[in-house]
Amino acid sequence: MELNNLKPAAGAKHAKRRVGRGIGSGLGKTAGRGHKGQKSRSGGFHKVGFEGGQMPLQRRLPKRGFTSLTKEFVGEVRLSDLEKLPVDEIDLLALKQAGLVGELTKSAKIIATGELKRKIVVKGLGATKGARAAIEAAGGSFAE
């Protein structure tokens, strides 16, 4: 066996349908499209979602919800995430570098989920009452 002798297995390849090439092929004249009608014509097919003139499903259903303009800009950080950070002074830049908030985030808030056992200094971040109490109980402080 050589590379120039390799061939696909018998029956693995199918010949392309050659339509409109005479009556003897079985696919001559109308090329398997039948007679007349929209689907027999070139370019003759409806657009996606078209239901023959009936009001389409997408337009029958009501609009719902809205797009929040502040979604990407306010981040949430857990106490358990702050525990894992290697730095003691925590601000928005430190959170971005650690990947805890997105690059587009403009402000962040600390929430009281998890535990904090070490002393940290929080600069320029918001915190819930529970989170503030937990940080101060661990010996930490807030610098505005």
Swiss-Prot record:
GO terms for molecular function: rRNA binding; structural constituent of ribosome. Keywords: Ribonucleoprotein, Ribosomal protein, RNA-binding, rRNA-binding. Residues 1-56 are annotated as: Disordered. Residues 21-31 have a biased composition (Gly residues). InterPro entries: Ribosomal_uL15, Ribosomal_uL15/eL18, Ribosomal_uL15/eL18_sf, Ribosomal_uL15_bac-type, Ribosomal_uL15_CS. GO terms for cellular component: cytosolic large ribosomal subunit. The keyword Amino-acid biosynthesis does not apply. It holds the Pfam family Ribosomal_L27A. PANTHER family: 50S RIBOSOMAL PROTEIN L15, LARGE RIBOSOMAL SUBUNIT PROTEIN UL15M. Belongs to the universal ribosomal protein uL15 family. Part of the 50S ribosomal subunit. Binds to the 23S rRNA. This is Large ribosomal subunit protein uL15.
